Amino acid sequence: MAVHLTVALQQTIFGQMERSFPNEGGGFLVGKHEGENIIINDVIAVANVFETEEQYHRYAMTPQNWAAMEDQADALGLALVGYYHSHPNAPAIPSDYDRVHALPNFVYVITSVMKGQAVDQKVWLLKQDRSAFEAGTLVVQP
């Protein structure tokens, strides 16, 4: 599985994640499936509603956020294909918390933000049996 996004969209994610630091930030990936590829056409930031004292290592959104983002993607003729979030002062590797709360068939882009700077970004897909994530290929295009 390869996930394609533009440099501009990657920079949008990096900027949001750096502004969210030292807390986690996140949002939705909007796009479409093309065979084994997922094309990201837009990213939509969503506010972190986790308890303030936990936002440095947890991210959550409301069901209303989810529904609104689905409507927005539908209006564009696209779909919610994934979710992105940051790991402040931690690697771009899914945590067990991420695995427990993830959905199969959704891609997960994780950005490592060290000392306020986005330093790494990786894409992951949860196995159907929810036992672990598998690494995908992130293709950043001009």
Q: What is each of the regions a protein language model found here?
A:
Residues 1-80, 88-142:
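Conserved beta-strand-loop surface patch within small alpha/beta domains used
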